[in-house]
């Protein structure tokens, strides 16, 4: 491994993750024009951000860097595929891994996997409906659209906030940090859908200032303990979201992991799999009609 990579990984273990993220969050919320305009302009240049799809195309018109980062798109920028029964991609990004949940483990990178139960906060009963099911890990790069949408119409059953570290998420840390996604802070949202259980897990990372959902707003840590909120009929008024509807967003972005139960859906064998994807594209079809692809290598 190159020395610069070793140095970067060492810094990941030594850095005060949450302090760095809080400081970045404050800077990203700053509304002083001389500060926020400089941050936005540098970001657009560095990452070659395409503003032509944004509802507000002028990057300096946003009130803060976070407003720019979580910008809305024009109504026709992400048309939803209309294949009956299809599960859609929830976000713009790149599929880093996709496949089956094998013996309660989810593939991370060569030589690394993490536990399904750990990912969902350590509750075996919560994880059981997804055992033997399917997963897709979608990485959102800095230049991507950072709102997360529903792959299927669903009724929210539970939201789980799991505190943790905030390692950077990139190919190097995926190859090198054991159980990366089950160690980083995350918010797991569990839904009931026409194809059975579905979970969307929004994973934080270094400098990810916050994670929001459309029903709870900003999800904040709670005494560094796992916090579960029930939303089913027995607990409070049910929340139903349509297919393609926004369900959450990242302020400075990271990763979304999608989980489905067993024998309901199969991923499409498309050129886009394990590569760039856009929100609204079909990722999976009912098991009887889709074609599976080889296991992750």
Curated annotation (Swiss-Prot):
One of its GO terms (biological process) is phosphatidylethanolamine biosynthetic process. The keyword Membrane applies. GO terms for cellular component: plasma membrane. The modification Pyruvic acid (Ser) is found at residue 254. Keywords: Cell membrane, Decarboxylase, Lipid biosynthesis, Lipid metabolism, Lyase, Membrane, Phospholipid biosynthesis, Phospholipid metabolism, Pyruvate, Zymogen. Heterodimer of a large membrane-associated beta subunit and a small pyruvoyl-containing alpha subunit. Catalyzes the formation of phosphatidylethanolamine (PtdEtn) from phosphatidylserine (PtdSer). Belongs to the phosphatidylserine decarboxylase family. PSD-B subfamily. Prokaryotic type I sub-subfamily. This is Phosphatidylserine decarboxylase proenzyme. It comes from Bordetella bronchiseptica (strain ATCC BAA-588 / NCTC 13252 / RB50). The lineage of its organism: Bacteria, Pseudomonadati, Pseudomonadota, Betaproteobacteria, Burkholderiales.
